[in-house]
Amino acid sequence: MKITVPELALVALVGASGSGKSTFARSHFRPTEILSSDFFRGLVRDDENDQSATKDAFDVLHYVAAKRLAAGKMVVVDATNVQPESRKPLVALAREYHCIPVAIVLDLPERVCQDRNKSRPDRDFGPHVVRNHVRSLRQSLRGLEREGFRHVFVLRSEEEIAAATVTREPLYNDRKADHGPFDIIGDIHGCFDELTALLTKLGYAVDGVAVRPPEGRKAVFLGDLVDRGPRSPDVLRLVMGMVADGTALCVPGNHDMKLLRKLRGRDVQITHGLAETREQLAGETPEFVAQVRAFLDGLVSHYVLDGGKLVVAHAGMKAEMQGRGSGKVRDFALYGETTGETDEFGLPVRHNWAAEYRGAATVVYGHTPVPAPEWLNHTLNPRVPRVV
């Protein structure tokens, strides 16, 4: 089996005592990435098999795991993890640090685990322990995804374990290898004529919805492609074409995601320009609308570019969320941060996250209209209000 894990993940090894978790971990992960419950028992009590040390050992393990995840380092938890209550803190840690929880399950026959433990004098704790491990594992195995594990891999034989490979892959938002130069364009809102005029001024060759960039340049669209303006379908055609050609990147805006929910048949409020977009799309073919739905569904919350020096997102991105993947990261990218209050128009009061930003990467974002583009703590919002 080919096991693919994100470069930043919390990997929980799951299996009965004797299933080979530690051997598997050493074969596929760096020593510094592996946090073993046995090691931490020894650390706090000088005895890796002292079960009375389990609580203290896991307190320290979770502490170290949190520090590694905060630093953007992978964590591999080498423990039995056969019960939901033992896995719950691991999923919570992954969510707290906006990384992806992965479960790799070694579901070997009980007989194999029993035989292995018999050959180890330090595992003389009776066959009932392994029996209970196997029972607990199989009772909860189907629920791992419901518990919050994004990826679950199950190995059911010694042969499968021996043949398994582990490959790391960057998150979708990792575009550090793209160095630009970039032309970053925010909040088009259906204004096709203005968009083509801007691209032309930037040196792009525009022919209808076909666009050819200047040599080496790439456009980056900050979302909110639709609503309010008169030509949302044409904006979508142009941007979708550039992304397909590899001449542009695009992140989603909150208006785009609201349109996607409507296209999926969800019940949404027809406000803030969505009525105009629906009316314009009504004149398009079902095939085009399906393409729009697929395009919007595939948009990534934010991108980290230029060796990590540049981050682009519709509504901004805090330093601790950059290059990570979680529901909270996506929500922040779409909506920014709010205070929980509403203004006199019933709209949410936005918290000025940029005033507190101290990250090393430059963050360019849109979403909130500003009187003029202004640099603030390595952030830039170029969205100037316009009359539509």
Short names for language-model regions:
Residues 2-14, 31, 108-168:
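Conserved GTP-binding G-domain of TRAFAC-class P-loop NTPases and closely related GTPase folds
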Residues 160-236:
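N-terminal active-site segment of His-dependent metallophosphoesterases
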Residues 12-18, 366:
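The Walker A (P-loop) glycine that initiates the GxxxxGKT/S ATP-binding motif of P-loop NTPases
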Residues 129-131, 214-216, 228-304, 309-312, ...:
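Active-site neighborhood of divalent metal-dependent phosphoester bond hydrolases
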Residues 347-388:
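Conserved beta-sheet core of the metallophosphoesterase superfamily
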Residues 191-193, 227-230, 256-260, 318-320, ...:
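Active-site environment of divalent metal-dependent phosphoester hydrolases
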Residues 43, 47, 82-122:
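ATP-dependent NMP and nucleoside kinases share a basic, alpha-helical "lid"
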